[in-house]
């Protein structure tokens, strides 16, 4: 959403989140260069965020102040995206133990803003360094040999997810047609788990 008084292309702020119970978190230096774009209510240029000025990989996540999320089972995301060049939008989760993961689901080659939906149960995950926003070994190196250089995180616990969001692992190309992502609304569907408890309820 666009808070009152915000005009033009400016870095996103907490006020761009429609739900006052949800915090936005930035990962990677380039995340602070993610800009607002478009006009609320416009059919031709709807309000969204745009990554063209992000000069490195970044991730943006959202955190409910009151609850964690159980995204196992039927947990899913519906978001509105547009991409340019070889850029893709990928899901990101931060688990209860602080581990950050980026998924292999990738929305690419979306020339106009369009709704995309996917289930977390269909996603494979790789560990993400939250500072550099790059993929890293998931910790299996201490165990048996990892065939084919695979670094997938095996059976991550998605029953208590602290934050959920998106990532673009490529630097943007700047203004004009080139390489970037647009992202409008983000809706997450799962079970709310009140912080400090282990009881899930429908959300």
Spans of features found by a protein language model:
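Beta-rich carbohydrate-recognition modules and glycan-binding surfaces
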Residues: 1-203
């Amino acid at each position: 959403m666009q808070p009152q008084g915000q005009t033009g292309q400016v870095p996103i702020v907490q006020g761009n989140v429609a739900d006052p119970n949800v915090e936005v978190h930035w990962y990677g230096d380039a995340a602070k260069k993610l800009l607002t774009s478009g006009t609320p209510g416009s059919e031709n240029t709807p309000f969204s965020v745009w990554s063209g000025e992000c000069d490195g990989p970044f991730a943006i996540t959202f955190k409910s102040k009151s609850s964690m999320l159980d995204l196992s089972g039927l947990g899913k995301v519906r978001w509105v995206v547009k991409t340019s060049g070889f850029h893709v939008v990928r899901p990101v989760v931060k688990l209860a133990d602080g581990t950050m993961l980026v998924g292999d689901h990738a929305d690419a080659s979306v020339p106009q803003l369009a709704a995309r939906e996917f289930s977390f149960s269909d996603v494979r995950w790789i560990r993400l360094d939250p500072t550099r926003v790059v993929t890293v070994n998931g910790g299996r190196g201490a165990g048996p040999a990892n065939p084919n250089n695979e670094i997938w995180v095996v059976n991550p616990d998605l029953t208590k997810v602290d934050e959920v969001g998106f990532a673009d692992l490529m630097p943007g190309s700047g203004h004009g047609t080139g390489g970037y992502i647009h992202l409008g609304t983000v809706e997450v569907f799962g079970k709310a788990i009140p912080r400090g408890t282990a009881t899930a309820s429908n959300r």
